[in-house]
Amino acid sequence: MVSDFMKGRYNLMKIFVGIDIAKLNHFAAAISSDGEIILEPFKFTNDADGFQLLISKLESFDKNSIIIGLESTAHYGDNLVRYLVTELYQVCVLNPIKTCQMRKNNVRKTKTDKVDTYVIAKTLMMQDNLRFVSFFDLDMMDLKALGRFRQKTIKQRTRLKIQLTTYVDQVFPEIQYFFKSGLHQKAVYALLKEAPSPKEVASMHMTHLANLLKVNSHGHFTKEQAKELRVLAQKSVGANDSAISSQITQTIQQIELLDSQLEKIEAEMTDIMKYNDSVIMTIPGIGYVNGGMILGEIGDIHRFSNPNKLLAFAGLDPSVYQSGNFQAKTTRMSKRGSRVLRYALVNAAWNVVRNNVTFKAYYDAKRAEGRSHYNALGHCAGKLVRVIWKMLTDNVAFNLE
């Protein structure tokens, strides 16, 4: 327990708390700004009881004098960071490169959880211009997680749609001639869930079949077209395989489940974006979801001292090819860095091209040089990165006419 005298003394100086993060148990220690050990390393669990133990150790000191640091390691520290920020502590997430440098300077080449707490605390103490995690940063963490989960969900859905097409080709190949817009629409899913084989479609009552198509296509299909579909079903050469028919029904149910999950994910992203009211939403053609994916991946714009660093982070910078005296004049984008950010930026760039004359002129100029659509779009995405960097850095609205 810290005496009142020592508490008053420590409140006059900064206290640096280093936390070594792990999956189940964390270690923490604290030093003063003159290097004195205030709290010996102690273990606490990665749960509510453990977090309370940490707080109880820090309660003896003035909250405003405490600076808490931890390394950016996977996701194990995310809950602790959220908890501490919510409790209004000053929290700094350190780049492991910084702590690695401090570890190398240690005379004793020892690496344990307890030693690492001091290394992290000393790294905090030696840093200038520390940036603390804010509530905005927590929202960006949420956007990043939601955006990446959205991408995974879309990939899952795409695989299921490919499987569904394969199944339908086997049991009812003629259906593709009737639904010219493709299989993946509400009317087709409604039909195949109820009648996943041509035999079942052919035996459906005409009034019911016509009504099912009409309701699920918002009146697009008529009774005459329903008759055409039934004739196709009667003449189908597809396999009458109950196992495949069952897979068709279940695959559609899985696709629809993923559709509903995507709606919820995008609604959450939209709510976060509306609350934060970022200047990125002033860019014509960028919506809440796409804007949210970009912001979530970028996080703190001040991590990037210039737009070229943001370009490299997105993998939109040109790769360099040089051998001896030869250096390639044209190279492809490096495609390193955040794949999700690169996808979001290229997608956003196409929307901006279609909604802004400056970007449209830039795209047309690249096409006039003989570049392909995707090559020109990559250049537009690079231009968009520079615009976004400037907007977020200076917090100014889009102003390119």
What are these regions (language model features)?
Residues 1-401:
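A detector of single, family-specific signature residues
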